[in-house]
C-alpha cells in the first residue's frame, strides 16, 4: 500500500475530499493524480456536481491547482505559521485516468484507511508539529428543559488549535429564545480555554448564516449552488486579540 484517498458527499450532493496521501518514495509518478481522478469519478457517478477540500500550505495547494481546483478562500493562522486553503472543482466532464505501470487501484477496507490516516498524520507532524497533544479534541454541549434535550452543539480543536463548529441544532419550538446563542457561547468559551485563538464553520444560506453574523462571525468565503438555490457560507471568529494569539495557542 503506497497511497490512498477518501471522500464523502453530503445531502446536497456536494463532494468532499477527506484525505489524500502518497508515500514520499512514490510521489511524482502520477499516483496522486490517479487517486484523485478515481475518487472524483466515483463522486460524479454518485451525482456530485462539485467537490471541495481544504489543504495547508505545506501540503498540496499546488497539486490541487494543477488538477483543476480553484481557491475560493483561505485562512492565515499567523500564530501557528500555517495557511489553510479552501478549494472547489466542478465535475462537469467525463473523468478518465491511466494507472501507472506496476500499480493498481483497489477499494480500501477500514483497516487500510486507518493505516493511510496514520501515514498522513506522521507526514503532517514531520512537516509541522502539532500545537496540541491529540490530532483532534472534541467538545459537546446539550441544552435541556424539564429533562428533555432541546438543543446541542458539537465542535473540536484540530492540529494547530484551530477551532471548528461542526454542528448546532435547536428544537424548532425553542428557537429565538437564546438557546442557540447559549450553546455557541459555551463552545466558544471551551475552545478559548483550550487555547484556540480562532474558530471557523460553514453553513448553508438557509440554515444559520444570519444567526452567525449576528454573533459576530465574519464571512470569509461563499460557494453558490444554483441547482439547489442555496449557498454555502464560510464564517470565522477570532477568540482573542492578535497580540494574545501566540501565547494562548502555546499553553
Where are these regions (language model features)?
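Conserved GNAT acetyl-CoA-binding A-motif
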Residues: 43-57, 191-205
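Helix-adjacent hinge/juxtasegments
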Residues: 23-33, 56, 165-181
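Conserved acetyl-CoA-binding loop-helix of GNAT-fold acetyltransferases
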Residues: 28-41, 66, 176-189, 214
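Short glycine/proline-centered loop/turn elements that form peptide/ligand docking sites
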Residues: 32, 36, 57-60, 77-83, ...
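Conserved N-terminal entry element of GNAT/NAT acetyltransferase domains
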Residues: 89-110, 238-251
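Conserved catalytic-core motifs of GNAT/GCN5-like acyltransferases
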Residues: 52-54, 65, 70-86, 200-202, ...
